[in-house]
A protein has these predicted regions:
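Generic start-of-chain signal for non-secretory N-termini
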Residues: 1-22
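NTP-dependent nucleotidyl-transfer catalytic core
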Residues: 24-49, 53-566
Length: 566
């Protein structure tokens, strides 16, 4: 037996679609837009699609009537088709549905797709911090929602192990001649935290050397202050050895360049050095992600994309492509020509790519004159890999709004190289930054608030509140409840706001039971369960359907029934 509410909404969407010749999914999206309860339960802006909607409304009404849909009323008001349920008749049908074993289940998509969601993909140079929190929570929530809709979802983490930042961290460990995993065990420090400290000291020391070389005294003094702070955070008397070792390098830039080029070629000892360091950071990531109940199906190494020859194939494809060019003495793709030839001339492609008006893009460099590749080149290869590996219909990249330009360049490059399907089905799910009141985040200087620290802060505050409310609570029970509150608080805070709005995270506000917060949601859920438990088995035959006429009861009924459609 089908859910009568969901079935009715589907029938309404199908009827409107047939009458006005608009895709049913588009009709459904409009129906799901928020509407004021006093006007309707659902509303459709029919005036957007028809100049004279009055004649169609009667047809829609007759069509719904012929399908025996007597539980809805339809009105045309100011160009909107307002749909309101007869709550008594609806409630009667819903109680029959429940008595026959029906329940509230998420509506499955008519067309179930294979979808890749790549998210988090943090640089393996320090712990996951609040700058990553929104990405990881949005990515995991999106994956769960798509899965609930019946899509086959593949969750992937891209390990960016070929960037300059990773090389700087690796140079730090090379300088002190330590293996990060072994050292972290020996000194009992979480491996990602250890690598983050070594990276910050190495990066700041090298920048200070560069400032002195340029005789920039003011900058050198600022960096000296940063180094003093980092020295005070030394986990095991490592600072002096690391600082002096980096200062002793004849040419740090040449050292960095050599490590980077050799690692891209897969040569030893650079391969073992960077792989072992990166693995130690990933172990730290996994420990944090496990607390948040976030898992991945695949961990993809950027270096594997290079070593497997996928990047070379992309460059060879480009060289034999009419859009290949030279830009700043480097191999490149002529992005402006791709836009003129393939985007501006095709209305459908233009709508999907959605180029900002007046936005001009330069050619995209694929390989530097020294033979090394850029991360955008590797991202092009990785995008093709994600589609091919999973036979994906869609690939969603959850990446910050600051990466709009590179993400746009990748799609245009794919289009120019002949990967039209991939270009049009690669989706950039962007989001704005997370701020912490009074806190600056700067990974190169070791300035960040880690997810571990935030979870512990929330957990400790939750334990304090639990003990205030119930002084006799068992410590283990309090700890278990507080952990769930901490995870719920963080996850809810990261996804409740529109992704395109900057988010300021305030722990006290996030924990406030009087606010729209994770703990409030958890409390409401537990309270509702307790009420149902105390009530016992519900005798649906004894319910008077007319009682649903009450404004609040009606509102609760409609909102609850809308849940599977969201």
């Amino acid at each position: 037996m089908d859910n009568p509410f969901v079935k009715t909404v589907d029938t309404i969407a199908e009827t409107i679609s047939n009458e006005i010749k608009v895709n049913q999914e588009e009709v459904f999206r409009f129906l799901m837009e928020p509407v004021k309860e006093e006007y309707a339960d659902f509303s459709f802006p029919i005036k957007r699609f028809l100049n004279n909607p009055e004649s169609i409304v009667l047809k829609i009404y007759d069509s719904l009537k012929s399908k025996n849909l007597k539980i809805v009323n339809i009105e045309l008001i100011s160009g909107f088709l307002n749909i309101k349920f007869d709550e008594v008749k609806l409630f009667e049908k819903i109680t029959d549905y429940i008595k026959n074993g029906g329940g509230i289940k998420t509506k499955k998509s008519e067309k179930q797709l294979s979808i890749v969601v790549e998210h988090t993909s943090a640089n393996p140079i320090h712990p996951l911090h609040m700058g990553h929190a929104r990405n990881t929570c949005i990515g995991d929530t999106l994956s769960r929602l798509l899965n609930a809709r019946g899509h086959k979802v593949n969750r992937r983490f891209y390990i960016d192990d070929m960037g300059r930042q990773v090389v700087i961290a690796a140079l730090g460990f090379k300088t002190i001649n330590e293996n990060p995993m072994e050292l972290s065990k020996k000194i009992n420090v979480k491996p990602d935290k250890l690598v983050g400290w070594v990276y910050a000291v190495s990066s700041t020391t090298l920048d200070a050397l560069n400032a002195k070389k340029k005789n920039n005294i003011e900058e050198a003094e600022k960096l000296a202050t940063v180094l003093t702070r980092l020295k005070s955070q030394d986990p095991d008397n490592l600072f002096d050895n690391l600082f002096s070792g980096l200062n002793a390098l004849n040419d740090p830039e040449k050292e960095i360049s050599n490590i980077m080029i050799n690692y891209e070629k897969g040569l030893e000892p650079e391969k073992s050095l960077i792989r072992s360091m990166t693995m130690s950071v990933l172990n730290g990531f996994i420990e944090t992600l496990n607390r948040l109940d976030i898992n991945f199906d695949n961990w993809d190494w950027e270096s594997d994309i290079v070593w497997n020859g996928l990047v070379d194939r992309v460059i060879n494809l480009a060289k034999n492509n009419k859009y290949f060019t030279k830009f700043k003495d480097a191999d490149a793709l002529d992005i402006p020509s791709i836009i003129n030839d393939l985007v501006k001339e095709d209305q459908k492609i233009s709508k999907i790519i959605n180029l900002p008006k007046g936005f001009e893009l330069p050619p995209l460099i694929l390989r530097r004159s020294d033979g090394s590749t850029l991360y955008t080149t590797r991202d092009i290869a990785y995008s093709i890999y994600k589609f091919n590996e999973t036979n994906a219909d869609k690939v969603i990249n959850v990446i910050g709004a600051d990466q709009r330009l590179p993400q746009l360049q990748i799609r245009l490059a794919l289009l120019g190289l002949g990967f039209k399907k991939e270009a049009l089905n690669l989706i950039h799910y962007d989001y704005e930054i997370v701020r912490l009141p009074g806190k600056a985040m700067h990974g190169r200087r070791g300035e960040y608030v880690t997810l571990d620290e935030v979870l512990e802060d929330i957990k400790n505050k939750a334990i304090e509140e639990l003990k205030n409310r119930n002084p006799n609570i068992n410590n283990d029970v309090a700890n278990e409840i507080a952990e769930k509150i901490a995870v719920g608080t963080l996850r809810f805070s990261m996804i409740q706001l529109n992704a395109m709005k900057p988010l300021t995270f305030d722990i006290n506000k996030a924990l406030n039971l009087r606010e729209n917060s994770g703990p409030y949601l958890q409390y409401t859920y537990v309270r509702a369960l307790n009420i149902l438990e105390k009530h016992g088995k519900i005798n649906y035959d004894a319910i008077k359907n007319e009682t649903v006429n009450h404004k609040l009861r009606r509102s609760m009924l409609i909102k609850t029934l809308k849940f599977p459609l969201i």
